[in-house]
Every structure is written in structure tokens, then in C-alpha cells.
A protein has these predicted regions:
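Active-site mouth loops of central-metabolism enzymes
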Residues: 1-3, 78-92, 160-178
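Conserved, mostly hydrophobic/aromatic
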Residues: 5, 65, 101, 122, ...
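Short, well-ordered coil/turn segments that N-cap beta-strands
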Residues: 16-18, 57-60, 106-107, 132-134, ...
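Surface-exposed, active-site-proximal loop segments in enzymatic domains
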Residues: 26-41, 72-83
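Alpha-helix-loop-beta-strand connector modules within alpha/beta enzyme cores
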Residues: 35-64, 119-140
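Acidic, His- and aromatic-enriched active-site or binding-groove loops in soluble protein domains
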Residues: 45-46, 83-94, 137-141
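Conserved anion-binding
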Residues: 71-74, 118, 125-170
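Conserved small/polar residues in nucleotide/adenosyl-binding loops
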Residues: 191-198
Length: 199
């Protein structure tokens, strides 16, 4: 609950921790094919950010994960068309989600979806809506491997068919990660994250 989260944040602050990262875990009844709950102004993440900022103001830095997998009924990171994730339609949803997060008061947005070109499009959308100062920390390198299982379990995310190999990286490709990081640098991101995913 939000009340428990606020108590936990107070404990973290007393330990000298100055920032937190939020990841959504929502009820199945709010999930659909495109993850529309992600850009609901009254959604869980948005309420959490507002409440944290109301209670802690600028004493705690809030990073929000930006992805659709916790919001989609199928568990994939984007909109499914003809059995596969549609990159461009997914980016549209991510852009909507980024604006709602910004309007809620988030300090940093961290896209973890691995859609091609999403960092630049999110940056354009934020700038267009007056959120020039909100940094983007993309997961530039995210592998389709088995190391991310505990996280997916923690946020109750499971795939309903298929895998993520079409948009996440193969650990067998030792040079692709450099191209991905370069692409995000060119798209004016502010730092880069690397993570391992599971199928």
C-alpha cells in the first residue's frame, strides 16, 4: 500500500538513501493488450509519485520505470499485433506514459522496454510538453536471458505465450550492446542501464 511505501521511504531516508526507483505491480483486472492503465492519471504509479512528493518533497529523488509489461494482459513489453510486439505502437504508449509520469512529479524516467528508437521519441514528447529538465535513464542494454526471473516474480509479470527475443538483445552478440548505447547517446539520454531479462 502507499502508506507502507511512505513508511519505508522514511526508513530509507534515515539510512542516508536519497533516491528510490518505482516499479508497478497492478491488479490483473486493470491490464489490457496495450497497457492503457500505464497512462491513467489516477493509476497506481501516478498516485504513488504524487503521494511521495507530497510527503517528502525534494528530500527523495524518484525514478520511475517506464515499460508496458506490468500493464499488459499478455505480459509483453508492448502492444501485440499478429503475434508479435509492434515497435511503433508501443512507443506511442510509452510516450503517453512518460507525460503522465512527468505530470505526476517524477524526477527521472527510466525506459526498460527495449523498443527501437524509444529514447528519442520520449525525449521529443517530454520537451514538447515542457518537461525539458526531466532526465531519461534508459535501459540501453537488456538481454533476453534467465537472470531476471526474481524481478519478474516480484512484480507478478508472466508471459502469456511467445518470448522477448524480438526486442531484447541476445547475450551471444558481443558487439550489439555498443550500438544500442550509441543509439541512446545520440537520442540525448542522460545515462545508461544494463539488465538481464528472462523468458
Amino acid at each position: 500500500s502507499l502508506d507502507i511505501a511512505l513508511k519505508e521511504i522514511k526508513i530509507l531516508k534515515n539510512l542516508g538513501i536519497q533516491g528510490i526507483a518505482l516499479f508497478p505491480c497492478i491488479n490483473k483486472k486493470y491490464k489490457d493488450n496495450i497497457g492503457s492503465e500505464s497512462f491513467n492519471p489516477n493509476g497506481l504509479m501516478q498516485k504513488a509519485i504524487k503521494k511521495i512528493k507530497e510527503n517528502h518533497n525534494d528530500d527523495i529523488l524518484v525514478i520511475a520505470d517506464l515499460c508496458n509489461c506490468s500493464y499488459t494482459s499478455h505480459g509483453h513489453c508492448g502492444t501485440i499485433i499478429d503475434g508479435d510486439v509492434d515497435n511503433d505502437l508501443t512507443i506511442e504508449t510509452l510516450c503517453k506514459q512518460s507525460i503522465i509520469l512527468a505530470e505526476s512529479g517524477v524526477d527521472i524516467i527510466a525506459p526498460s522496454d527495449m523498443m527501437d528508437g524509444r529514447t528519442g521519441e520520449i525525449r521529443k514528447e517530454l520537451d514538447k510538453n515542457g518537461f525539458h529538465k526531466i532526465p531519461i535513464f534508459p535501459y540501453s542494454v537488456k538481454y533476453a536471458s534467465s537472470f531476471y526471473g526474481p524481478f519478474r516474480g516480484a512484480v507478478s509479470n508472466s508471459l502469456n505465450g511467445g518470448d522477448r527475443e524480438t526486442h531484447q538483445m541476445s547475450f551471444k552478440n558481443s558487439s550489439e550492446y555498443l550500438r544500442e548505447i550509441e543509439q541512446d547517446i545520440n537520442a540525448v539520454s542522460n545515462t545508461h542501464l544494463r539488465a538481464h531479462e528472462t523468458d
